[in-house]
Amino acid sequence: MLTRRALVVQSQGEVQVEEIPLPTLRDEYITVKVKAVALNPGDWKMLYGPHATPGSILGCDYSGVVEKVGRAVNALLTPGDRVAGFAFGGCPYNHDEGGFASYVTAKGDIQAKLSDSISFEDAATLGVGITTVGQAMYQALGLPLPPAIIQEAASILVYGASTATGTLAVQYAKLTGLKVFATASPHNFDLLKKLGADEVFDYRDPECGAKIRTVTNGLLSLVFDTISEGSSPAIWAAAMGAKGGKYTALLPIKNFPRSDVKVTTILGYTALGVKVSDHLPANQKDFEFSAKFWKLSQHLLEKEKIKTHPVGVRQGGIDAIPQGLQDLKNGRVSGVKLVYKID
């Protein structure tokens, strides 16, 4: 029996590296020999939160080399291809899912084939970000997909722009022809301006929202909030123009501050076309859109139109990931995405 090493949830807050069977390849899936994985805030929240499921494998972001391709995969992938993709980390319904493993089985159409110019470490940062940007900006906000650009003069606020998802959002927004306003800590201003942000504001400034509203002449109508908690609702509500607009969040917002804004909360897992919860059944529409967006993103990566997020590469492989999750949980990681090489 073929096996793999994986980071498996034991109970809420507890994980262990286990040697487990390599699952039978499903028709829409590929098997990837993992070369690197990246950590996201959602990973530690899944582990320490109420939805931690014993037996599930953590991790969403990975890169590696294709070993097998299921017969129903539409993406043009063959064994030996270098890829990066998105997995359902902590899946409560199918414990074959999850990215923190020596081998991953993942939806074959939610992948990008990589050129040799991008390292596995850099590519491992892409999975959650590409999936989320596609859902938030192009499905929820209704922006035209590149190379098409928005016809009317328009701007967008990317709140939390220095996150791995935020840096991608800034770049896609520029490719779509938007003027991009962003919030971040001051030490990340230069990075965001290099990626295309027109102006960046300190989210800790009590006047942040008012300043954005002034600079945008009260016309801001699009917001993508990558944080969706803390001070973010108050800031974007103050920044948005009098006519309201559209707002996309990654978490549900309680006590929503404005009634003239269309609010959409997205969840990346729905892009996989599988059951997420009893309230979120498999969504084929989200899957088909995400497959299309990943194909587009592969093209943009090949043309070097998209740059990856800064990484902090750590040694130790799968065994060292629990410490990284602790560091993320305790706020010890800033400005980089933690990446682990997998032997």
UniProtKB/Swiss-Prot annotation:
Transmembrane segments: none annotated. Pathway: Mycotoxin biosynthesis. NADP(+) binds at residues 42-45, 162-165, 185-188, 203, 333-334. Substrate binds at residues 128-135, 268-272. Keywords: NADP, Nucleotide-binding, Oxidoreductase. GO terms for molecular function: nucleotide binding; oxidoreductase activity, acting on NAD(P)H. Its EC number is 1.-.-.-. It comes from the Eukaryota. Disruption phenotype: Targeted gene disruption leasd to a reduction in ACT-toxin production and pathogenicity, and transcriptional knockdown of ACTTS2 using RNA silencing results in complete loss of ACT-toxin production and pathogenicity. Does not affect growth rate, spore formation, and spore germination. Trans-enoyl reductase; part of the gene clusters that mediate the biosynthesis of the host-selective toxins (HSTs) ACT-toxins responsible for brown spot of tangerine disease by the tangerine pathotype which affects tangerines and mandarins. ACT-toxins consist of three moieties, 9,10-epoxy-8-hydroxy-9-methyl-decatrienoic acid (EDA), valine and a polyketide. ACT-toxin I is toxic to both citrus and pear; toxin II the 5''-deoxy derivative of ACT-toxin I, is highly toxic to pear and slightly toxic to citrus. Belongs to the zinc-containing alcohol dehydrogenase family. Monomer. Gene clusters encoding host-selective toxins (HSTs) are localized on conditionally dispensable chromosomes (CDCs), also called supernumerary chromosomes, where they are present in multiple copies. The CDCs are not essential for saprophytic growth but controls host-selective pathogenicity. Although conventional disruption of ACTT2 could not be accomplished due to the high number of the copies identified in the genome, the high sequence identity among these copies of ACTT2 is likely an advantage for RNA silencing, because it allows knockdown of all copies of this gene simultaneously. This is Trans-enoyl reductase ACTTS2. The gene is ACTTS2.
